[in-house]
Amino acid sequence: MAHLKLDTLHVQRSPRGSRRSSPSSGRSSACSSGSISPVPIIPIISISHDGDESESESEIETEPARLFQRRMSTKCTNNLAAIIKEGFLLKHTWSFQRWRRRYFRLKRNMLFYAKDEKCDVFDDIDLSDLCYFECGIKNVNHSFQIITPTRSLVLCAESRREMEDWLGSLKTATAPQRPRGDSFLIEQHDILSNHHHWYATSHARPTYCNVCRDALSGVTSHGLSCEVCKCKVHKRCAAKSIANCKWTTLASVGKDIIEQADGIIMPHQWMEGNLPVSSMCAVCKKTCGSVLRLQDWRCLWCRATVHVACRPQMAVACPIGPAKLSVVPPTSVHSISTDDAWDVASPKGNFSPLLVFVNSKSGDNQGVKFLRRFKQLLNPAQVFDLISTGPSLGLRLFRHFEMFRILVCSGDGSVGWVLSEIDRFNMHKQCQVAVMPLGTGNDLARVLGWGSSCDDDTHLPQILERYESASTKMLDRWSIMVFEKAIPVPKTPKMSISTEQEAMLTGMVTSANHHLRFIVETNDTQTLIRSTRNLCDTVDDLVCRISEHHKDDEQLAVKCDILRQKLNMLLDALQEEEIGAHSGDDLIATIRSLIARSIPVTPGSNAYLLNPNISIEKTEKDQINTKERRNSRSLRSSEKEALQCRANSVKRAIYNVVEHSEPGRPKRYQRKLSITPFEALKLPTASGESTPCTSPLPIIPPINIISPTMETSRLTCISPLPDTRRDSVDENFFNSINLPAPRQFADSRRSSGVEVIQEIEEGANGETVYRKSRMSLTGGANIDDAGNRLSPCSDAGENTPTERKVDFLRVPIHTGEPIVDPLCDYRPHEVFERTYYMTREMDKGKEKDKEKDKPVEIDKEKDTCVEKEGSMPAEKLVHTCNLQVPGVVVTPNPQNVYSSASITIIDTDAQTTTEQSSSDDLGGEASDVLSAISNEECSVASEIFDKQDAGQTVGDIIQNMDASNFTHIDSPETSDETEAMPGESIMDDISSVLGHDITYALQDNTLTDDTTTLCSEHAGPPKPPRKKSLSALSRTQAHPRRRNSSPPRMARLARMDSDDNPQQFGFENIVFEIDNRCDDQKMREPPRYCSLAQFVEGNDIARQSFKQLMLEQHRGGDNDSDYPEHEQTPTNKGANLLATTSEDELSTQTAIKIEIQDIDATVRNLNSSMKPNTILTTSTSPTKKSGHGQDVKRITFDESCKKESFDDVNPNYPQISVVVRPPTPLRGDCIKPTVSLLPVSSGGAMTVSMTCSGMLGVRAMNASEIRRHSSHAPGLAVREFDKDKDRRHSGFNPNQLTLDPEHARFLSSSPAASRRISCGSLFKPNEALPNLQTLKGSKSSLFMGSTLFGFDHLASAEKDKEEKSGKDKEKTPTDETNRKLPIINPLVRLPNWPNLANGGGFISKCLLANADTLCAAVSPLMDPDETLLAGYHEKCVMNNYFGIGIDAKISLDFHNKREEHPEKCRSRARNYMWYGVLGSKQLLQKTCKNLEQRVQLECDGQRIPLPELQGIVILNIPSFMGGTNFWGSSKKDDIFLPPSFDDRVLEVVAVFGSVQMAASRLINLQHHRIAQCQSVQINILGDEEIPIQVDGEAWLQPPGMIRILHKNRVQMLCRNRSLELSLKSWQEKQRQHSISIQRDASSTASEHANSTDEVISERECYVLLNFIEAVSSLVKWVKFLIISHPALQHDLYEVACRASEALESIHPQGKLLEGPSLRTKLVEVIDSSRQLYDDACTLLRDRGHSLILREDLETKLSAALANMEMELKKCSVQKCIDGKLRAYFNVLAPNEESDGRRKSRPFWVRLRSGSTAGQQAFKPPLTNTREAANNWSVNEVVTWLETMQLSEYVDSFLKNDIRGKELLTLGRRDLKDLGVVKVGHVKRILQAIKDLSEN
């Protein structure tokens, strides 16, 4: 029974297949399994016995137990063997053509499949004799078939890539075992194995199997075809075929190798049968091949076909075929060396191998056809599929070729892939890349001339010829460098408390902020009490709840205590405010008494001073806060400000506590995810009220605890360096430890700078007097505020002036009372101006109270003050004290300011070496950035501005950017040790606009060398004074601070010659050279540099940064001058100054010399207007050369210094030149002081040369100003102050910048580092600062294209300068060679292109104009060569274009669509349709709207103001997204250069919307051009990703910075159509000529070989006479050549004599021979004349360069050789039947001269085309035109037939005498009458006749 069941089971399973394995294999597998069978043993034994019996009967169906044996073996094998690949595939079932999903598992030589992976039973297939192939030509469904001797499976993969993976895995599973199992050896084995690569196909004609020789089955002859050699087999015969595919290497040639003396010969490789239609035998020229059987042969290389009988007569060597130049012969590839490259032996002759990469997926899988076609034409080893192998394998194999070409058959993305691999292998110099367009866009192929698409592979041989004749051009490639601000998403909860408790905690913080705001803003007592009580309860509850969850956290406990203390201080401030409010005027006295009792005396030997490592104690902090309160109470509303400070302090403490309770959260996310970002409280202020701002200290937290708001994220994106150092610092780092910073890098607000010793003493009038002493530079003495040396142990009342030190910050101010600022060490200097103005107002108010009965005008006050100063020049100043911010030091002596009615000169460089913010340098007008922001953005009116009824002020300050101000890059100026001070509202408003980082840049006192604002006004008549006036701001600092002090001169001199690294100095610090326009002598000064901080990895500052300073005294002199005042001048005409300087002062003084151009005329004009008692006194000025040969620098105020209107300029005003010696930080000689003052009347100008010691004096109110900038200033500009400051010109900007040409030339040549933001983004300094001499013509300035910079001044100045100097030379037009990049579109300057910020207006202009100054503190010193790309990585390489915005969004959507539905994107037309649909979608959605708010664009370092746009495109080639010329034209114009891909220039255009992108495909748009530049930077702001595409490949880019830099250049092959036409015409001519010679020679030979009469015909006789003439002439001139040059070869003379003797033998005694003997004799003549011709040509070719021939001899010899060549072509020597050689002449050779007869063209046609006589001489002869064909003879018609390979109809055409005229009129019926019956032949002849007629 059991046996029957088994049989029944087997019968049911048998129809699944007839595959049977041998019994032996069944036994071996059963025995090797080693497991117990679940079925009984007896059936298994019987099974084996039955199998042995049926061993020879494979078709017997009785094998009962075989199924069980196979299943058990499969299960055990699956558990033991290694799996190569597994996964699901679709298996084709033969019933109803359905597909089933099956799980396949591939192992070594075995394939298993089942329904799913969990099945225990798998069907197995033995792969020992495997054949696999693709199903179909295009193979759209990614199917392949597996054929073994027993099974055949059709499988389908999801994608072509997966199919390629399975085929590769099958190849690996069946490949022999090798020591190295990498993919390269697998591909190498595939290349060298000569195995066929099958694919299933059908045939249109009968085809026969190359294995069994039978016809393929079916009407369509369906079978398998090898994609390389076109071998045809049945599917059942594929496994039996031998490996005789096309050869690849010398080893694969095998036994067919032919070796000769010259080397290895390339033999033919024959394939039998299945010849193409109308194949002709290469030997007998007859048709071969058959559709009836497999016969005849074809060569796989040269494509020659021969009969079986003719094959032995075929030449042995294979000519390789039409693509010989591109083919790598297998005989040249010997082996693969150890470096995975071929050992190549270059073949003889021309050889330019072609490496082909084909993307089989491109063009709707068109790449598959091209891949197979290329393998058929070329060596299969030089054709690679990018999908399966990639470019690396082919490039490695071709590495040893000296030069080769690469053809990439794909789209732009694959081209970029190949070029990237070329970069990796560094093979730019040895390869040239061509592109065959198979993709959708193909922009690069369009530009290179290869068209938009290539779909037909039938003309591939002709296409290869085009690539062989291509020319080479260089393609620029650009690196896309990306600096991403990656923010990881936190995975854990950010706080240790639960979510509910976190919400409660957030509510508490919000409530506390609410109550704090009520406390600060309310005026209601009840509300104040209620909010205070609620605040205390909330803080207590908050502290309790947080402490419960963090009981063991000691730091948190400390922070909670700090919070309670700050809350108590807030309550104390409230109490003080209430006391002051009720006590009225007693408030100040009460506060003074409290402060006096609370401040302890600080001893000189403080523990902090002795040990800098000890942090600042709490008492010191309280002392600072008390002092600040004491100072702030002297102003109106100071109580509110103090209360505001305390509230902000409490708020910050709350934030610190909450942040510390979130240890798991990154610091930059803590505040964002839990509570709102910290925002300082502000005082409510009316718009018209002037709120005093006395405190400069920041109210925002330090940089390391700033939340990543929008503002800060924008700024962090600007810095090219990663912000890990800033973000990684603990927020409490500076709270707990006070690091000992080096003095050069010390923070001015920390005690780690220069230590301060404070002493308090009681003054004579009962006031408390503070005296501060500071350690001297050498450490040997202490210096007080007045600059006097103090003994280390001096008492309070002792002050011995032992040594005078240099004043680096001295600001003398006229006032009557000393104002002491004890907090100067803890404040930056940016609100110094405001503090001074407020103090001045207070002083003026006191003076007015004292002098109520005597109204005094301001001018008289000032004159009186000046007179007092002049009367006591040597008197020591009693009320001199240090002015640190915000205190004011009062000094009555303005020694560096001269004011008059016509001009005011201020020296801001002299010893004011402290680094200042941009807010310090501007005065009463709205030229300050802070003032501008306060005017336009803030509700707080700053006291920087004049009040509404105030007169015009001249109290502006120009910041001094001395390069000696060393600043640590990460200097902790924002330490929490500095408490928030009053006056924070204005800074909050700034921070809301600029962001916290820029606000810190404003508050920091460490700016670099980038002053950007110049203020000046032309001297004019005095304006009426306003009611109120603010005096000029002045500064003093008696103690030199280490950080800001200028080193002594001798230290610089000693270091001058020892600096070997010039790159360490800032390139703006080099003092620029400016010519003196009024003096012939040009003075120079040696360059001065600023030292950079040296950094080492892992540390902050290297030892090299700390340089020891030395002091050396220099001798100097005192210059005294008195300047009498003019009697009738209403304003101050001069200042009586006595500059008493010490030796140390002289070492750092700056001399300013102002000279009058045309001084004689000026003096004459002045004398006529002045009274006789006017005295002009000038001090003796030494030689301009001073110091150690140091030259004086001279700045000229020429026409560029006129005011902007240029209307009311007095032509009598002389030109003023300023000679400056700016202080040098490291190098330079001593500068001797020069004092020379010349007061003049208001109607004229004046000359001033004065010594400035760093002090600023009072200027006249109504005087014009001329300000001298330090060496970092970009140039000199003029600012016009309007009477009404609110009414300005449309293009007026008080912060306008202009560049002096000399300064620009200096900047462009400077190589070193800078802290400029604008220069830091430059990639080479000289690329962004062009020579401004070319500014007017090319509009390619650094600032051209923006209305922020007044180039009208520069243009006018240049024009006037040319007129003055009399330069009337004609200037040549500016071409592209003279244009400097970047070239900015002038449209950018128009109003419709808004400014950088959306708000626009004055604020944006100020921000951009002062960008370098604002960002200096947060910008590290950037070296353009070293730190430029720090933190960047190369994302990709751009070859075509870069897009950000809408175009990238469309490309990204298309890419996602193609990945999701590949079947919808398989044709080019469908892809274009999808692009249109997605573009229309963007028209409605506008996902990239307002892109200008999210990105910033810089071109060559210049910030470009962007309009409202949706995208930015950067073009390298003039083709964009499918052939659009998005630039708008391909030619140059007045502004831009012509676009090209080999000029290292990028074109930047704007994309305003999808409508514009669509319209640009139809018309050329040019309004959207932005710039042409050499480098681009794009800053992505915000937190969202933005779509970006490069060459059509799109992705989403996170926020950060993108830089596009030039990477390299690659050689590209461009189509050369002119060369193609020339080669085509030449080849056509050669083919016709050779065919004609062969036909005539064969016909003549056959005609005369059979005839008995060997007499030369009459026509031949005519040719013979021409031949004799040519030989005679050649012999004559060759003999004459040898005689003229005896040094030449004598054997040539012998050859000439032999030819002459042979020639004499055919016409003895002047008569030609007759009969057959003539032809025999002619053979000798022909041979000797040919030898003479060859030897003569060889001699001239070898020795022609050294021969000096006479002109007539050279001409005649050349003509003789040319005639001889033509005559030899007409001769032929043939062997007759009798064995003799006879000569024959070709009388039917075509005439090479073109028919000169042409139809006369009309007169107007000839006139329009011009003279064509010279042009026609160079045109090739047109032999296939209608005119030429109309004159053809019968023989020429026959030649025409033979060129079309239709020689079988020659006899019919000869018989009917068909000439050219009849040929052009032949029709289909006529051809039938002539015997042309084949339809294909009729069509070919008719088409050829049509072509002739059309030509």
Swiss-Prot record:
Residues 1832-1895 form the SAM domain. Residues 82-175 form the PH domain. Residues 349-485 form the DAGKc domain. It comes from the Eukaryota. Keywords: ATP-binding, Cytoplasm, Kinase, Metal-binding, Nucleotide-binding, Phosphoprotein, Repeat, Transferase, Zinc, Zinc-finger. Its main location: cytoplasm. This is Diacylglycerol kinase eta. It comes from Drosophila melanogaster. The lineage of its organism: Eukaryota, Metazoa, Ecdysozoa, Arthropoda, Hexapoda.
